[in-house]
Amino acid sequence: MAVVVVTDSSASLPAELIGELGIEVVPLHVLVGDTQIREGVDELAVDYAADDVTTSAPSPGELRDAYTEALRRSRGDGVVAVHLSRQLSATWEAGRQAVRDMDAAESVLLVDSLGAGLATGFPVLAAARCAAAGGTLAAVYEAAVRAAAGSRTFFVVNRTEQLRRGGRLSTAASFFGSELVSKPVLQLVQGRLELRDKVRTRSKAFAKLVAAAEEAAGAGPAAVGVQHLAAAEAAETVTSQLRERLPQIAEVHIAEFGPALAVHLGVGAVGVLVLPGGCG
């Protein structure tokens, strides 16, 4: 058969790619009061700014079931599971517990994507393409690790209060984002969200976003991802500017943030991911 790649729903990859490459996706959970929503499975309107809206990782049992099915599909070739940053979610740790429960440390290899959203999706894509090309378990794992280490991610959010409330951003960084400036620019550094810049207007924030992506891409080919939450026009503008400034872009993916990330980023958020060298 072939190595099978597993991820969580934060990866934000289009359904056609998931199907084409045989990627197994485990849903994250959004909790609205006493109601639990499985991202990508259950439909329910969500007020992302509401105080009673939170998120949770898949359980070790859910991940164990997904890994077991993926192992069956691989017919012994093995599984590479790529999950969102362990600094941002308990998903990776739940995956590690699942692997322990399965006694499958040599056949199910875990990768911390050091990101979320397409910053998880790109390492997944690199791994799945390597697997589709006949890569060994070790080669598929290394493809994911390289993509995770090489990607650079930047965000513009309207306010940082939701990130701070959810524990994804320090109180100090949140203060700068909510009190002193109107539009903070954030970046992911080793899987952790940090404040990168402080600007007064949304247009200046997007200019910083594009400049950061251009610097990260360098002169060679690169894959670019643009994500947003209810900000399609802004995402299209950013994408157009990136295409103009980075003619060497190998591929571009545009996606809306799923509910589990939207709860923390808030309406109007726009993110850009750059992976120099592309996704394989």
Explain the meaning of each model-derived region.
Residues 3-65, 69:
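N-terminal glycine-rich anion-binding loop in soluble enzyme alpha/beta folds
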Residues 4, 10-24, 29-33, 78, ...:
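Mixed-charge interfacial surface used for oligomerization/domain docking
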Residues 53-60, 81-92, 113-117, 130:
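Short gly/ser-rich anion-binding loops that grip negatively charged ligand groups
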Residues 61-99:
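Active-site cofactor/cluster-binding pocket
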